[in-house]
A protein has these predicted regions:
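N-terminal secretory signal peptides that target proteins for export/translocation
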Residues: 1-21
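Generic short N-terminal amphipathic or hydrophobic helices
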Residues: 11-12, 19, 31, 44, ...
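Sec-dependent N-terminal signal peptides
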Residues: 18-37
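C-terminal segment of classical bacterial N-terminal signal peptides
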Residues: 35-45
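Cellulosome-associated attachment modules in secreted, modular CAZymes
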Residues: 39, 526-611
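Metal-dependent phosphoester/phosphodiester hydrolase catalytic core
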Residues: 49-465, 481, 489-527
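An anionic, turn-rich surface loop/hairpin at beta-sheet edges
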Residues: 467-477
Length: 611
């Protein structure tokens, strides 16, 4: 087979990051562009087979069941290709040759791969025009394609590294610890590249520099060659909606830097779902599209992963101007209801949770929406602090500061429905929500859902005080709190998910007996008899009447949740299920196992469960 034929079979896609590009391209061709994204100032002249430095070494991203994306930033002009295969040291496949420009990001996607498979790859490069038999060979790395259900795998999580430097020992240790964990992928939930540090500048290249620093081997480059990195923005990346209309917006610059240096998922109609709403402020002529790359979801093994964005659609400033390093050009409205996903993202989240039957469902964002109702360390409540306690309020939980259920007073039911985020999480079997922002480790439970505050890998101490206290409360529990620094390692197996706090510095916990580890059970069929919603052991007309009443909005809360009423497993309990129960009670044959043990693990409860 010729190289051309192999490339066509493997559907290799090349997208230059130093030129116009479009993410999510699904065409069977090589796309090569030559327009420059950044000024080219080669640091050295490369002769044949002369090694060079890479400001951005190989970074893998956007893994799917059949493809991987690799991004590099070389310090000199090069011609290069990748060799790869499924056995270490053996590379039966080779991409076409591509050219990359000095100091500019360059990215290719390799498709046609096999799911649930580890691939080994290496780059070979030389100066453009050098002999085709003379190459510099870089180290071998590897990556996984999508795990199959039932396969055990590891992923890792960090938050709030706050533009850590290479001299930060705890941070560097954390990066090396992540590499030692060999995760299938890593999720970082923000306050990382820290747009605030470029406050006195109005130049895109300063944000680019911050992102390139995180490509170093002291940072995400320690593991990014073999571990895809998923980014979720934090408040200090300044992508809040009220910042995106500035004459020079660091939020927009942050989006553009992320698009250039870190492959991030977009809606592709096949593997990833996500935001399709364009942002006109993004320089389409340079970056190829106006996609925000802010929220997205995918499945891997037995788990669903959902990254949400509380920032870009929050248009009014709820706290004192300048608190997070923004400009002082926006006035404070002081309203915690201002924090929102907006209807489109809210409905996307709802549908994503409802449409998945994964054993585990994990959600991620830097902070919640609304937060607790008190000032923390001199900063007003609008700055959004807290986890399980905060899940009671505003768009997340539906209550206001006066403990009144007023969700639909502030959210149009035609756009948002009648249930706030936490209720959607409960009804759809969310296993855990990982959040940052408060600079400490906190393990909490609310309605069986883990609320996990992620520690910083770069800080020391116990974070902000006045937010969390270990104890059991009326509707949630704060199980344990620990100081920084480190990361989370989550091992997902069919039997359980194990969450471990891997420390990279000295850590103390409350209670002191806490082992920095806990497990999460998978979503399993609910115990009970299918069709029996009143708990009497039978599936009959009494149950059908309860289902019909709940579907009509009548109060049936004393029987809720009524997962056993979803007899046709469509995630709803309605008149269709009632008819099936009545037919079964009358002795008619129905295509559902009514009267058998086991009920759906997660459903949308009928209106009568929340009258």
């Amino acid at each position: 087979m010729t190289t051309h034929e192999r490339n066509e079979q493997l559907k290799i896609i090349h997208k230059h990051r130093n030129a116009i590009f479009s993410k999510g391209v699904k065409v069977l061709m090589v796309l090569i562009f030559t327009l420059s994204l950044f000024q080219s100032n080669p640091k050295e002249i490369v002769n044949a087979a002369t090694p060079i430095n890479f400001t951005g070494p190989e970074l893998v991203g956007n893994p799917t069941n059949s493809s991987i994306t690799i991004n590099i930033v070389p310090d000199a002009n090069i011609e290069y290709h990748y060799q790869y295969g499924t056995v270490s040291g053996t590379y039966p496949n080779q991409t076409a040759n591509f050219t990359a420009t000095a100091n500019q990001p360059d990215e290719i996607s390799i498709a046609g791969l096999v799911a649930n498979t580890r691939y080994y790859y290496r780059m070979r490069y030389h100066a453009p025009g050098d002999g085709m038999d003379d190459w510099v060979v870089r180290d071998e790395h590897s990556f996984m394609t999508q795990r199959a259900p039932g396969e055990t795998f590891v992923f890792t999580v960090t938050s709030d590294s706050h533009n850590a430097s290479a001299s930060n020992t705890g941070f560097v240790n954390a990066m090396n610890n992540i590499n030692a964990d060999h995760p299938d992928f890593h999720i970082d939930i923000g306050d990382t590249q820290f747009a605030e540090f470029t406050r006195n500048s109005s130049i895109q290249t300063n944000l680019n520099t911050a992102y390139k620093e995180y490509r170093a081997t002291t940072h995400f480059g320690a593991f990014g060659h073999s571990t895809p990195v998923f980014l979720s923005t934090g408040n200090h990346e300044e992508e809040e909606g009220w910042n995106l209309d500035d004459s020079y917006s660091r939020g927009v610059a942050n989006i553009q830097a992320r698009k250039a240096f870190f492959p991030t998922p977009v809606e592709d109609g096949v593997f990833y779902t996500g935001n399709t709403d364009p942002l006109a402020a993004i320089d389409e002529a340079t970056y190829g599209d106006e996609l925000r790359e802010d929220y997205y979801a995918w499945e891997w093994g037995d788990a669903l992963f959902v990254v949400i964005d509380p920032f870009q659609y929050t248009m009014n400033l709820p706290y004192a101007p300048g608190t997070a390093g923004e400009e002082n050009d926006d006035s404070q409205d002081g309203n915690q209801w201002s924090w929102t996903l907006v209807a489109e993202q809210f409905q996307w989240l709802k549908q994503t949770l409802e449409n998945s039957d994964a054993k585990y469902k994990f959600m991620f964002s830097h902070n919640m929406l609304g937060g607790i109702n008190r000032t923390v360390v001199g900063v007003g409540a609008g700055y959004v602090r807290g986890g399980a306690e905060a899940a009671r309020y505003y768009e997340w939980g539906g209550k206001d500061a006066y403990e009144e259920d007023v969700f639909n007073d502030f959210r149009d039911p035609e756009d948002f429905g009648t249930k706030p985020i936490h209720q959607l999480m409960v009804e759809n079997g969310v296993s855990a929500y990982f959040h940052g922002h408060d600079h400490q480790y906190v393990y909490e439970l609310r309605d069986g859902i883990v609320y996990q505050e992620v520690p910083s890998p770069a800080m020391t101490g116990s974070g902000f005080s006045g937010i969390y206290t270990v104890g059991t409360y009326e509707d949630y529990e704060t199980v344990a709190m620990c100081s920084n620094a480190g990361h989370l390692r989550i091992t997902v197996s069919p039997e359980q998910a194990t969450v471990v706090y891997v420390n990279s510095g000295s850590v103390t916990c409350t209670p002191s007996s806490f082992t920095r580890s806990y497990t999460i059970a998978p979503n399993t069929p609910v115990e009970g008899i299918l069709g029996d919603v009143n708990g009497d052991g039978n599936s009959n007309s009494s149950d059908a009447l309860i289902v019909l009443s709940g579907d009509a909005g009548m109060d049936i809360s004393s029987f809720c949740p009524i997962n056993c009423g979803d007899v046709n497993s469509d995630s709803l309990v309605n008149s269709t299920d009632a008819l099936a129960i009545l037919s079964f009670d009358a002795g008619l044959t129905v295509p559902f196992p009514l009267g058998s043990a086991g009920c759906p693990a997660s459903i949308t409860q009928p209106a009568g469960c929340n009258p």
